[in-house]
Regions:
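Hydrophobic residues embedded in beta-strands of well-ordered beta-sheets
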Residues: 143-145, 366, 385
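Sequence contexts marking disulfide-bonded cysteines in secreted/extracellular proteins
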Residues: 92-94, 117-119, 346-348, 366-368, ...
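Secretory targeting and sorting signals
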Residues: 1-36
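Surface-exposed, charge/polar-rich loops and edge strands
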Residues: 42-117, 122-127, 132-136, 140-143, ...
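Feature marks extracellular polysaccharide-active and adherence modules
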Residues: 362, 369, 374, 380, ...
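Tight coil/turn sites that cap or link beta-strands
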Residues: 346, 352-356, 363-365, 374, ...
């Protein structure tokens, strides 16, 4: 098994900022994007041990409700109350090619795999356990491109005991480290190993892909979430599943089902959406082409809704269980977690991609969405800044700002926020990385 040795991590915001943190800002540092050491040469099928912060996404969006389900369950005691280990340990072991968790002592943490034990020892992996692992392609310069597992690994990233430095093993799909960037992306497109459509189904370029994992780096595709909840109700993933299968079904459903007609904050209404979507999938002709030349049968369409079981049974019955049940359904966990997320203010101006020069926000709400900003950023009194999944090089200053909402963002320069509404952590807000001095004074929680 080949191993990628993680580089030394930049300093964390620690004791020197204790007084600042007490003002309401928890600033969890993560390594700079792109700072990871390149992977060694590898052959298809090799297993690489990596850190989550070394991985480059190959899709711009995720179904966030799927991740909210995982995070809601990871933070719950329901599994332990039922006599099981918390699902996050089973998920990590499975993703690492080691089956399920075998021993999970008190104090075990995802970020430290030596603190718990999986049922399959390292080196004893089976074909079945290897098949459950997530996939990576080695790109130019040894960069690591994740082609499967964005939802699972983002869940580990956002888990309270996980984070960007959590290690995991991935199975190598191909080594294109010797190719140029242009030839590399040609190969990725030819093999359908990259998803170049946004959350509305519109095409994007490779330059618009996120540069690292984390909830705040991805856009939300509600149809991708919907397809996740229809699994084993309207379709089941075949053994030779198409790449990005759930996005293919999601695009098909987007043309046939208006999610705006449902209240996705209400469990009963969301369940109706799942039922309506899954019934459409089952009603499709097996030979109907859904997307990319794939038929409904090839994408796992079930012959009978809910696999022939009554609504109160099978997967739909499980999905319907409320949070108060002994075994809550996935929807209940997802909606409970989502209810705890503080939404950023609505954008009046949105900036994306590379930008050079000073940025002065003097009114309204300016949103930096996966923006690479080079130059000072100033937020005037009464104005708001939202930075999601962005990389800022230069000083950032806000005095009397209405809101400063920073999640999943790297700031390489001094940060000063005074007398403002400030949010840098909490459910749904990915950890930030700060590479300069930080001054946070007399702020309120935004």
């Amino acid at each position: 098994m080949s191993t990628v040795t993680p580089p030394r991590t930049p300093r964390r915001l620690g004791a020197g900022l204790a007084a600042t943190a007490a003002l309401g800002a928890l600033l969890a540092a993560a390594p700079q994007a792109g700072a990871a050491s390149p992977a060694p040469a590898a052959r298809p099928g090799d297993l690489l041990t990596v850190r989550l912060d070394q991985l480059l996404p190959t899709q711009p969006s995720v179904g966030k409700d799927q991740i909210f389900y995982k995070l809601g369950r990871y933070g719950s005691r329901k599994d332990e109350q039922a006599g099981d280990f918390n699902k996050r340990f089973d998920d990590w072991c499975e993703t690492n090619g080691q089956g399920e968790a075998e021993k999970v002592p008190s104090g075990a943490r995802l970020a430290d795999p030596t603190s718990f034990t999986c049922e399959i020892p390292l080196g004893n992996e089976t074909d079945e356990s290897r098949a459950a692992m997530k996939i990576v392609v080695i790109g130019p310069g040894g960069s690591l491109y994740l082609t499967d597992g964005h939802h699972s690994l983002t869940s580990f990233w956002e888990a309270a005991d996980g984070g960007p430095e959590t290690p995991i093993r991935l199975r190598v799909q191909a080594d294109y480290s010797g190719l140029s960037q242009s030839a590399f992306w040609d190969e990725m497109r030819a093999h359908h190993w990259v998803w170049l459509r946004d959350e509305q189904g519109a095409p994007i370029t490779t330059g618009e892909l996120p540069t690292r994992l984390g909830l705040s780096r991805f856009h939300d595709d509600p149809y991708r979430s919907l397809v996740y909840f229809t699994r084993d109700i309207g379709y089941t993933a075949p053994e030779d599943a198409a790449e990005y299968l759930e996005f293919l079904w999601g695009g098909w459903l987007r043309e046939r089902l208006d999610l705006g007609a449902y209240d996705l904050d209400d469990p009963a209404s969301y369940l109706r959406a799942v039922r309506d979507a899954s019934e459409l999938m089952v009603a499709a002709d097996p030979d109907e082409v859904i997307a990319d030349g794939r038929t409904a049968a090839e994408l796992g369409r079930l012959d009978e809704w809910n696999d022939g079981k009554k609504a109160e049974k099978g997967e739909f019955g499980k999905l319907s269980q409320p949070l108060t049940a002994e075994k809550p359904g996935k929807l209940a966990f997802a909606l409970d977690y989502r209810s705890r997320i503080v939404a950023p203010p609505r954008c009046t101006t949105t900036l994306r991609g590379p930008r050079t020069g000073p940025l002065v926000v003097d009114s309204g709400v300016t949103c930096l969405d996966n923006t690479r900003q080079t130059g000072p950023v100033v937020v005037r009194a009464g104005a708001s800044l939202v930075a999601l999944g962005s990389e800022l090089t230069g000083p950032v200053q806000a005095v009397g700002a209405r809101d400063v909402h920073v999640c999943g963002t790297t700031i390489d320069g001094p940060l000063s926020v005074v007398g403002s509404g400030l949010r840098t952590e909490g459910p749904g807000c990915s950890a930030n990385s700060f590479g300069g001095p930080v001054q946070l004074v007399a702020n309120t929680r935004g």
